Amino acid sequence: MTSIHTGSNNNIVELDMSELIRPIPPVLDMNKVNSMMETMTGKTPPASCGLTSEDLEAGELPPVDVLTFKKSGKPYYFAFGGCHRLRAHDEAGRKKVRCKLVNCSPNTLRLYLGASANKFLDSD
């Protein structure tokens, strides 16, 4: 299962959870988080999630789409979605999460964050 924005993007990396900037507070369905945690232990995903065991490596969830850009050589990683997958990783005590990186421009980041983007984009 892939998102409409990153279906052809195979730029998947593992990032430390601490590297992700999550500017939007999540609204979580803990039943969904718990189901994802069970999937992470190797249990077959429920039919309602739209995934089959063939879609995933055992114990893995789909990667989280992450917008990234570099400023002064330092990469910044923004996760605007994937809140249930990220919480499942938190709850399971996993320090790393698979992410599908999507390069973005400063203007794209401003579309997502508005004036709040300035804290990341303004000069050092």
Curated annotation (Swiss-Prot):
Among Gene3D superfamilies, the record links this protein to:
Conserved hypothetical protein from pyrococcus furiosus pfu- 392566-001, ParB domain
Q: Which reaction does it catalyse?
A: S-hydroxy-S-oxy-L-cysteinyl-[peroxiredoxin] + [protein]-dithiol + ATP = S-hydroxy-L-cysteinyl-[peroxiredoxin] + [protein]-disulfide + ADP + phosphate
Q: Does the keyword Lyase apply?
A: no
Q: Which GO terms describe its cellular component?
A: cytoplasm; cytosol; nucleus
- EC class of the enzyme, as a word: oxidoreductase
One GO BP annotation of this record: cellular detoxification
Question: According to the UniProt entry, what is the EC number of this protein?
Answer: 1.8.98.2
Check the record and name the InterPro entries matching this protein. ParB/Sulfiredoxin_dom, ParB/Sulfiredoxin_sf, Sulfiredoxin
Q: Does the keyword Ribosomal protein feature in the UniProt annotation?
A: no
Enumerate the subcellular locations listed in this protein's record, separating them with semicolons: Cytoplasm; Nucleus
Using the UniProt record, give the first listed, main subcellular location: cytoplasm
| Sorted UniProt keywords | Antioxidant, ATP-binding, Cytoplasm, Disulfide bond, Nucleotide-binding, Nucleus, Oxidoreductase
User: In which domain of life is the source organism classified?
Assistant: Eukaryota
Q: Which GO terms describe its molecular function?
A: ATP binding; sulfiredoxin activity
- Function (record text): Contributes to oxidative stress resistance by reducing cysteine-sulfinic acid formed under exposure to oxidants in a peroxiredoxin. May catalyze the reduction in a multi-step process by acting both as a specific phosphotransferase and a thioltransferase.
- Which PANTHER family does the UniProt record give? PTHR21348, SULFIREDOXIN-1 (PTHR21348:SF2)
Family of the protein in this entry: Belongs to the sulfiredoxin family.
Subunit composition and interactions: Interacts with tpx1 in response to oxidative stress.
**What is the name listed in the Swiss-Prot or TrEMBL entry for this protein?**
Sulfiredoxin
Q: Which gene encodes it?
A: srx1
